[in-house]
């Protein structure tokens, strides 16, 4: 009863993110909750006075173009990160597909969070002594995702997809290419995995939402200075499998 919510869906389009955020700023809302990296970037660019809480954002320093990072943005932006347990996901790839000769990493080149995860997965595989060739397969958007996925499926023994908004929106398309080709897909989070993967080690997004909501209450009630609020993460991690694809 104390809060009015204005929920808008950008439908995966960056231009829509900008339009929605600009409308919020013109209305002088009390807080902007930005779900995903593109929305957070639009909000951070549009206002330096309205508190902005991000959620489902993987890499805050990259999203906000910050050269130094200690967990606190130091401005009107904070929130929660959905950064996956990448070291453990690298271990999962090697455990499930131990004889892989080529591991493909499929992601959208326009998403800095995906680039960040890719770098860590590659270094983690190297540290674990992985002998497979690790190759990146990047698409720029929905127009070329099918062609790039087809190339990856033709060359790889296993494909890894990080937490990637474009891939999540096109998971069915990816599955329609990889499953007939017999190429297993291991994913960075549960939503993508349900659409096209065999397994993931994922955070609990419900818990992430709860944490973000608690931060919003603290900001709105004046109990916290957002410029001093550290970005938080979900604590629970769980393994998820899709049995019908694992067969």
Kindly label every feature range from the protein language model.
Residues 63-71, 145-148, 193-202:
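Glycine-rich, charge-decorated loop segments at or immediately adjacent to ligand/cofactor-binding or catalytic sites
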Residues 30-32, 101, 157-158:
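Conserved acidic residues
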Residues 6-66, 164-188:
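Beta-alpha junction/loop-to-helix N-cap segments that form part of ligand/metal-binding clefts
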Residues 1-14, 76, 122-142:
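Short beta-strand elements in bilobed, periplasmic/extracellular small-molecule ligand-binding domains
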Residues 192-241:
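Flexible loop/turn connectors
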Residues 78-128, 225, 229-244:
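An alpha-beta-alpha
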Residues 135-144, 148-196:
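Flexible, glycine-rich surface segments
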Residues 60-102, 203-224:
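Hydrophobic alpha-helical segments within soluble ligand-binding/sensing domains
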């Amino acid at each position: 009863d104390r809060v009015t919510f204005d929920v808008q869906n950008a439908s995966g389009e960056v231009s829509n993110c900008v339009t929605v955020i600009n409308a919020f700023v013109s209305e002088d809302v009390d807080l902007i909750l930005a779900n995903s990296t593109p929305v957070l970037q639009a909000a951070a660019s549009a206002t330096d006075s309205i508190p902005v809480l991000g959620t489902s954002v993987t890499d805050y320093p990259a999203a906000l173009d910050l050269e130094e990072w200690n967990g606190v943005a130091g401005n009107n932006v904070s929130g929660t990160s959905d950064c996956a347990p990448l070291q453990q996901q690298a271990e999962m790839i090697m455990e499930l597909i131990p004889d892989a000769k080529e591991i493909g990493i499929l992601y959208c080149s326009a998403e800095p969070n995906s680039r960040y995860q890719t770098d860590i997965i590659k270094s983690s595989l190297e540290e674990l002594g992985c002998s497979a060739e690790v190759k990146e397969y990047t698409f720029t958007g929905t127009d070329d995702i099918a062609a790039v996925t087809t190339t990856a499926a033709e060359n790889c023994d296993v494909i890894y997809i990080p937490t990637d908004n474009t891939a999540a929106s096109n998971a069915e398309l990816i599955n329609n290419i990889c499953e007939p080709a017999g190429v297993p897909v291991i994913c960075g989070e549960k939503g993508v995995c349900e659409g096209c993967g065999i397994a993931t080690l994922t955070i609990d997004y419900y818990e992430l939402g709860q944490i973000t909501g608690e931060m919003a209450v603290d900001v709105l009630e004046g109990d916290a200075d957002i410029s001093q609020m550290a970005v938080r993460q979900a604590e629970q991690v769980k393994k998820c499998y899709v049995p019908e694809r694992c067969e």
